Design a protein with these regions (language model features):
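Amphipathic alpha-helical coiled-coil segments
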Residues: 67-79
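Short, charged, amphipathic alpha-helical segments
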Residues: 55-64
Length: 83
């Protein structure tokens, strides 16, 4: 099956080094970017636990991280278009 990703989604994915081809299922691309986000959030939590960042800055850093992954807030059905 061939998928036609929206340009806005491709742009966001490419910011994270993800360039899905026409045969890449949206579920696979979504899972990959979600795994990257989870890796970063876990690393941030570990920095908090080890004292590398103060607790008072943790929430703002989590918010900044979420802002770097807006594509995850889009439903997967929106990632592709049907022409």
């Amino acid at each position: 099956m061939e998928y036609k990703y929206r340009e806005s989604v491709l742009s966001e994915l490419s910011r994270h080094g993800i360039v899905p081809g026409p045969e890449t299922p949206p579920d696979l691309a979504h899972d990959f970017v979600n795994d990257l986000y989870r890796y970063e959030i876990r690393a941030l939590r570990e920095q908090l636990r080890s004292g590398l960042i103060p607790k008072s800055q943790y929430a703002s850093r989590v918010e900044d991280l979420r802002k770097r992954y807006p594509v995850l807030s889009l439903p997967k059905d929106y990632w592709t278009r049907s022409d």
